[in-house]
């Protein structure tokens, strides 16, 4: 194990002293992504021009990706619209590497979703792999053991020539890294839409478990405490990734950005996880920060800024893979599998012993000071002398102009049912087969089969169930459920309501599993903030999500904003991905999405309206217009209470939410989950809700779920729904003998035919 710096190349170093005497020196601030007003502000803060190293730090830390400079004025709502009741389970909120939630019995869970969109388009395998690695290190840095990951994904049109390249690379990268770490992949989404052509969305969620006393924070306190960098060596990969890739739009005329994509090593990260957990268990580190976006620039400035003093480090002590790296490149490098920690002098020997045990390289960089300054030297000469808060926290804040798009009124007036493509299909059975074989509704087993969903042995549920479920405590069965959801079409039609709908579906998915929703993380994927119409979409979505979280009583614990998701002037649909975490007293009581027992009654909970605008069926007919389904969060809460209580008390044997694809999709998915058919009647539903059989099947009305109820529990279940005043209707029974889905008077489809159609689509395009 090497603990001393590698051979360094000699450079003409731009020192602080030199910067003070050479104000005329030209610097590449624009090439590093800074605006002219931002460069002027840096000069004002420092009272001189920045050194090359300081410029590198400010450029990455003031990037859109790191500073949230265009979004933070809106994101403040997540902290403002929080009641005391919502804070009850919150141990660590927005501002740290990940939120932490109390789940009872002294256990806590930390979870977060982030994006790695732009790198995954440039270099699909490594971009996706390091997206998993980065979010897992966020979880480690909170003091937790990672226990699962999820991956909400969006690609362009399934038949576009470039989609196969992206799908193969991204799915392989996620599976290759996550499987090597030994982390189950318990859920996510796979959506295909031409609006994501050239801008795939690769969002990654990780969850970890820890005891309350094990929580760790990112701060550097205690004058004289040592600062150490450990893990992989620093190389040239990922230099400027935060500013070059994640903070500007793509332009095909610009040179290749492959060098800005990080390269990951999951086996090095696996060792790093165990190494960190041993450090935490022995209380050897006082503060810790993972190195992700902006690398050492971020770690040093955030640790110092969050602490009580300052920091002084020697950059030549950094272990390098490439000795030709300049100081600025070392500061900006986003090489993976690295951590920075603060260690008391008394714990130095213990720290080194743990490093030796795990054969992890490390280098002592410096110490915590009382100066309030972040000072970085290169071979004894100062190249950075800044107030760390100006780098990490007090960057520019833009209240960018925004306005409602002029075209939106016409779009919202163009309802599907009033359009010329809304003809009711003559053969409803064929329509169901068409729906379930469409790219978005087809089985995603081609993807999920490449992931290990059950490694570690604590997975109680995973895709295709509504939520992923993980056991936390083997003795009591205490566990958590997670679901991620978003619908870009809904948000395009109405960003505020679309964001509410994303939360409502994720909340509902957690409840159908039987867990009680507790907290939220979000990844807000949008186009350029410099476009006032995109900024309006963003502002509306954030307001809608914040309001919905308040109404449902679930706080946002943290997340990510990904802007500039557009090629040229074409932006993606606004896509706020929402992750909801819920808790089980015992995961053994979790409810799967498919029925299993012959003769059980099948009930539909909720009201169905003629709501097909933005639906999957409308999408298949090439239509996008109108208003998304009405969201009634009060009804969502009532539905969740019914589902949670019914699951806990053994009143339901299966539960599946209704969302994309409506009742048709839910019936097929519940039947195919365990290969058990059903006999269904829709006439009473059509009469009760004043809709046609076609609308009953394909409407995407919200606050609905399908459940199967044992005959012995029907009276109790009906009484509960009636007492709560919630709409419920017996549609039919589970039929284990027929091997078919029989919707009486409409169609009968064998499960073999449905399964063949459902599972053939992705292999057809991707092999």
Curated annotation (Swiss-Prot):
The keyword Glycoprotein does not apply. The keyword Coiled coil does not apply. Mg(2+) 1 binds at residues 114, 560. ATP binds at residues 68, 112, 522, 559. Part of the phosphoribosylformylglycinamidine synthase complex involved in the purines biosynthetic pathway. Catalyzes the ATP-dependent conversion of formylglycinamide ribonucleotide (FGAR) and glutamine to yield formylglycinamidine ribonucleotide (FGAM) and glutamate. The FGAM synthase complex is composed of three subunits. PurQ produces an ammonia molecule by converting glutamine to glutamate. PurL transfers the ammonia molecule to FGAR to form FGAM in an ATP-dependent manner. Monomer. Part of the FGAM synthase complex composed of 1 PurL, 1 PurQ and 2 PurS subunits. This is Phosphoribosylformylglycinamidine synthase subunit PurL.
